[in-house]
Every structure is written in C-alpha cells, then in structure tokens.
Amino acid sequence: DVDGATSSSLLKLFLHSVGCEAPVHIPEREEGYGPSKTAVDEFAALGTNLLITTDCGTTAFEVLEYAKNKGMDVIVLDHHEAETRLPDICAVVNPKRLDESDEYPCLKYLAAVGVVFLTVVAVNRELRKRGFYQNRPAPDLMKWLDLVALGTVCDVVPLLGLNRAFVRQGLKVMSLRQNCGLKALADKASLSEAPTSYHLGFVLGPRINAGGRVGEASTGSRLLCATDDFQAAMLADRLDGFNALRKEIEAYVLLQAIEILEGTPQPYPIAFVYGHDWHQGVIGIVAGKLKERYGLPAFVMSVENDEVKGSARSVPGLNIGALVMAAKEKGLLTKGGGHNMAAGFSLEEKNLEAFRRFAGEYAERALGKEKIVPTLEIDGVIGLSAATPEFADKLSLLEPFGAGNPEPRLMLGGVRIIRSDIVGSGHVRCVLGSFAGGSLKAMAFRAADSEVGKALLNRRGEPFNLAGTLRKDTWMGRTQVQFVIEDAMRG
C-alpha cells in the first residue's frame, strides 16, 4: 500500500544519499503480506547481510528466523499491532510493542513511514556524531517530508501531534514539486493547485495503491524513487491505467457484496461477506465502503482453492487489529495483522463460520448488542450567503484534515435544487439556490444510485437541508467554491 511504498522509498533514498545502494522488494499479492522465504532467498543470492522490513515484520517470526539462519542481520521498522513475544532479531522498532513506554503516546499513532523517518533522523544524527559528514554533504532530510505526509494520510492514522506536523510540513514540501515521481503523478491527475490532504488521500494515494491492487506492486515505490522525468512519466501513466482497472473491478465486487449482505440475515453487529475468486486487490476498498454504508465493522473475503484472504475496516470503539490478533492466537486465522481501524488476514475456508462467530461476538462485547444507527455529526450550520471563498479559506486554516481531525461538516440550510444532472462515474452535480437569492455549485460523489442522489435528481425546487463540506475547486485556472454533499433531508 502507500505506507509501504513511501516507507521503503524513503529508506532507499536516505541510504543512497549516504552511499549505500539497497534494493527494495515489494511483495506481489500472490506472495502474501510481509516478508517471505522467497524474498529472503532472492536477497541471500545477492549476498545481502542486512535485511530491513518496513510496514511489516513484527509478527513474521518464522521468516525472520529463516533470514537469520541465512546469515542476515534483521531490523523491523513497523507500526502494526504486536504480540506478547517479538522476533529474535537485531531490532524491532515499533511504537506498538507491548513493552514500549507510554511516555510519548503520540508515537503510537505513527504510520510506518513516520517510524522510518524518525529512524532515519536518529541514524543521521549518529553518523554526524561519528564524523561521517566531515568530507561529504549531509542529506537534507526535510525534502522527504512529502513522502512522510503521503504515507501518513493514506494509512488513515490520526492526524494528531507529530503526525499533524509531518503532514502540515510535508504538504509544503510537496507543493515545491521536487520529487519527480510525485510531480509526474500530479500532472497525470491534472493536479495543478497546491496539494491538500484530500489530494493525498483521494487523488495521488489511490493511483499509487493501484499497482499493488491490480498491477505490479513495485510500481508505486519505483515511481517515488524515480530520478528522471521520462521514467517518472512512464510509471505515472502505468499507475493511472491500473487505477482505472481497479475502479471497474471494485464496482463489480461491491455490487455483489451488497446483494449478499442485504439478501441474508446478519446476526452480529458486523458486515461479514465473502465471495469466490473476488479480486484480492480491491477487498480492502470494498470493506471501507461497506463500513461507510452500514456504519458497521466490515469483513470482506475472497475464497480461492480452499484458502481465504480477507480485509477488515472498523468503526470507533472496535480495535480491528486486536480482534484479528486474538483470532490468530486462537488458531482461527493462519495469518493476520493490522491496527485500530484496518486489518488483513488469511484463513482456511473450513474456519469461515467459526471466524464469523468469533468476530461477531468480539464486536458485540466492544460495541454492544443494540443495533448501531449511523449518525452524522454536524460541526456548524450556515446559509447559502455564507458559502463564500473567504469562508472556505478560513476553514482551510484547520488543515490538514484526516483521521483524528476531520474536515468540518456543515449543514447548509434552507436551499433548493435549481438544476441537477449525472456526470462522470455516477456523480450528481447540482446548482443550489435559496429563497433569498444567490446560487452555489454542489456535487454528490458516486451518489446517482443512492437515496440522496435520487432525491437531488427528482425533487428540484423543493427545500432541502444538506450536510457536507465546503471546498474551493480549481479548474482550468479558475477557482470557485463548491459544496460537497454527503446527506440530505427535506427542509
């Protein structure tokens, strides 16, 4: 994923800057998550004596022991949930180690790329102390904060404390367009304005992720490490193509998952669904969309040759990573790991129903047995006349937005739909008006088939209260304010 691509790229770029060339291995989906014996064998054939894992490895006991027996020193740089025991290797750098001090609680929120950046800072300080830079320039670590920001936002870790500082400064670095890979990807996505956390999470991130989902897993990391514009443009073009394919596959799997969930009883406060030969590259995205649709923790799995691979996304109140680790320790899963809001796992098909019961009962204990009613928290109420570029500028001072610091959700009261139509991939475009005069453009993304979209399309002229966010939209060099609709109710 993006956290893995950015953390491995950052480490590779730093090592290159101090004269050490380090090949990067990003596992293809068929190889499975985390380090594998195949990868260890490939590195051993190159004469490798130091193996570093990023964004994985904390619970990879067998493979890391295998690497040790091949004569390698091993270091893990990770942020996923740990077990009571740790691999017997040189170092496990992970703020979620169970023996880790609580002196700096904000470190427990770090993405893997944040862990790698702090490791690089510490190594750089030690090199300076030992006189390594007496006859060579020290690298400018700040220039890599764009990678730190990208991985942090895309891994949906809370944007609090150090993470907030990383993203705020990283966005400034990204606006300089120094990384030719990110520059090429932004150009491919027609992103010419100053980037925000929205662009990281919903424009650049999905394209980098697409390689690992439906194409070649290493493409994203290769792009971020690209050293010339031609190579970067070629890789950006490939990722854009992978992303288009990913959208098609995702729509198909999502439709099937919804049909299954709404056609069968769901006895627990979870959305638990599986299908045969669903593309494993999109099940994580589908889990996220099911979580949003039903307001429940979502488990989505693909069954292939009696083996099941799954992905889960959670809601506040349920640590999904801890659930997966508990199921693994109980013997229900063959592999698994994650953090508060997301997890991945594997199991045998014969254990599917046992895992459903375990996950459902675990969720019941955490969330209660009462039916979860999805709620939409509103931060403020405005009228149409207040939806101005100046007000949007003031809201942007609260950036970066993301997990732990969500974009302010506003209720736009007393408006009517003047015009509405469907554009793009099922988006509903509107022009809003008020009885006091004035107009405002609005968009409800991927809403054409939803109840909200149907209301916007079929009830023109009627009064509505709309919930959503106010953003500035730049197109062809022209900036306007736009309301992004999440929900609607009759006024």
Give a label for each model feature.
Residues 79-80, 95, 279, 339, ...:
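Histidine-centered active-site/metal-ligand motif
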Residues 31-32, 98-103, 385-387:
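A short acidic, often aromatic-flanked loop/helix-cap motif at beta-alpha or helix-coil junctions
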Residues 26, 54, 76, 94-95, ...:
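Flexible glycine-/small-residue-rich
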Residues 1-50, 70-71, 88, 125-357, ...:
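Hydrophobic helix-and-loop "lid/oligomerization" segment in the mid-to-C-terminal part
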Residues 114, 284, 288, 466:
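Short alpha-helical basic/polar micro-motif
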Residues 41-133:
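Active-site cavity-forming subdomains of large catalytic enzyme subunits
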Residues 231-237, 241-273, 326-491:
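Mid-to-C-terminal polyanion-binding domains and interfaces
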Residues 24, 76, 92-94, 149, ...:
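Structural signal for conserved beta-strand scaffold positions within catalytic alpha/beta enzyme cores
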